[in-house]
A protein has these predicted regions:
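DNA-contacting interfaces and partner/effector-binding or oligomerization modules
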Residues: 1-27, 34
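Nucleic acid-binding interface residues in structured DNA/RNA-binding domains
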Residues: 7-9, 72, 79-197
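Conformational gate/switch positions in structured elements
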Residues: 11-15, 62-63, 153
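Residue-level marker of intrinsically disordered, low-complexity segments enriched
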Residues: 16, 64, 68, 188-194
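A generic structural signal for ordered secondary structure
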Residues: 17-20, 64, 136-137, 143
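Compact structured core domains
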Residues: 20-86
Length: 197
């Protein structure tokens, strides 16, 4: 039986659902982006829904120290500072998706790349002359660990913001945050938050 553990994190841009297998981060996304996985029935798994700071104490089932790591990462990220330590995570997907997500992680905090640029890199990795930007976009849509595996850093060829599961307003806010131009930050303190829900 597979165990799945869930916690929520309230960010300035909405509630984030975090999933772990008890050892590493397995999913992280804005709650309304893909539906509430914790509310789904898992016949082959044990589901424990943990909420708020109660989920982050060391006394919880299995310790679940991964939730502490993720909360620390998210706190730093949403304060407008690049997190120093990335929580341990495990990605599950097709071989193609895994290559796309691996290359995606190489895009630095505060930087962006286009779907076409990412497709070129993936094509080289796969020993192909070309790769469809649309195929890369489909793999990005399946990314289970948003923010940590930064699909929001991929933009359209003309610099336009397109295709983010969390919504384009949220994508714009995340990029502004990383580039130090978020009007809702005062240094590393949050002032007021744009309405992105």
């Amino acid at each position: 039986m597979t165990s799945r553990f869930y916690a929520t994190y309230t960010s300035p841009l909405g509630e984030i659902q975090i999933e772990s297998d008890g050892e590493v981060l397995t999913a992280l996304d804005f709650r309304e982006s893909r539906g509430d996985a914790a509310d789904k029935s898992h016949s082959d798994s044990e589901t424990l829904l943990l909420r708020d700071d109660k989920s982050l104490s060391s006394g919880d089932k299995a310790g679940l120290h991964i939730f502490d790591e993720v909360k620390t990462w998210l706190d730093a990220y949403f304060s407008g500072c690049q997190p120093r330590h990335t929580p341990q995570f495990r990605l599950s997907g097709t071989p193609f998706q895994l290559i796309v997500w691996e290359e995606l992680q190489k895009i630095a905090y505060g930087e962006t790349a286009t779907y076409g640029q990412l497709a070129e890199v993936v094509a080289v990795r796969r020993g192909k002359a070309k790769m469809s930007a649309q195929a890369v976009g489909n793999a990005l849509h399946k990314n289970p660990i948003s923010l940590v595996v930064p699909c929001h850093r991929i933009i359209g060829s003309g610099g336009q913001l397109v295709g983010y599961g969390g919504g384009l307003q949220r994508k714009e806010a995340l990029l502004a945050l990383e580039q130090g131009r978020a009007s809702w930050l005062d240094g590393c303190r949050i002032r007021s938050v744009p309405n992105v829900r």
